[in-house]
Swiss-Prot record:
Task of the protein: Necessary for efficient RNA polymerase transcription elongation past template-encoded arresting sites. The arresting sites in DNA have the property of trapping a certain fraction of elongating RNA polymerases that pass through, resulting in locked ternary complexes. Cleavage of the nascent transcript by cleavage factors such as GreA or GreB allows the resumption of elongation from the new 3'terminus. GreA releases sequences of 2 to 3 nucleotides.
UniProt keyword Transcription present: yes
Keyword Coiled coil (UniProt): no
Higher taxonomy: Bacteria, Bacillati, Bacillota, Bacilli, Bacillales
Gene from which this protein is expressed: greA
Gene3D superfamilies: Transcription elongation factor, GreA/GreB, C-terminal domain, Transcription elongation factor, GreA/GreB, N-terminal domain
GO molecular function annotation: DNA binding; RNA polymerase binding
Protein name: Transcription elongation factor GreA
Superkingdom per UniProt: Bacteria
Sequence similarity: Belongs to the GreA/GreB family.
A Pfam family this chain is assigned to: GreA_GreB
InterPro entries per record: GreA/GreB_C_sf, TF_GreA/GreB_CS, Tscrpt_elong_fac_GreA, Tscrpt_elong_fac_GreA/B, Tscrpt_elong_fac_GreA/B_C, Tscrpt_elong_fac_GreA/B_fam, Tscrpt_elong_fac_GreA/B_N, Tscrpt_elong_fac_GreA/B_N_sf
Keywords per UniProt: DNA-binding, Transcription, Transcription regulation
Length: 158
């Protein structure tokens, strides 16, 4: 039997996924079933766009429930025990400057399940995180990005 994928995440990230799962199971699922019921009442299902739309949404919701359930079941909680606080690792926030112009950026490195670049949380599978993991303050690192290579210097890890 194949081993299931492990999803590294913070305790906060796991709680957010659990909340989303609960919402989908208790609220959204019922809303979609009601939409299907209403659409069925319109008659002929062969040309019923409301019915098709509701069925598509139901498939999406059920798929998301399955995905979230799997992620939560296979979550590996990242604990910040304070050890190696000078090394970039999962759960750490790393601040670096882009060389040579010195533009500063900060990201928290998290598991893919809770990545949200708009909130400054990047996946440990991202090119930037892969380049930074295991490095220390003062290290200069070449990062591969979709836009090409960039050289950065790590200035802070917290």
């Amino acid at each position: 039997m194949a081993q299931e994928k492990v999803f590294p995440m913070t305790e906060t990230g796991k709680k957010k996924l659990e909340e989303e799962l609960e919402y989908l199971k208790t609220v959204k699922r019922k809303e979609v079933v009601e939409r299907i019921k209403v659409a069925r009442s319109f008659g002929d299902l062969s040309e019923n766009s409301e019915y098709d739309s509701a069925k598509e949404e139901q498939a999406f919701v059920e798929g998301r429930i399955t995905t979230l359930d799997n992620m939560i079941r296979n979550a590996k909680i990242i604990e910040d025990d304070g050890a190696n606080s000078d090394i970039v690792s999962l759960g750490k926030t790393v601040t670096f400057t882009e060389l040579p112009d010195g533009e500063e950026e900060s990201y928290t490195i998290v598991g893919s399940a809770e990545a949200d670049p708009f909130e400054g949380k990047i996946s440990n599978d991202s090119p930037i995180a892969k380049s930074l993991l295991g490095k220390q303050v003062g290290d200069e690192v070449t990062v591969q990005t979709p836009g090409g290579e960039m050289l950065v210097k790590i200035v802070k890890i917290s």
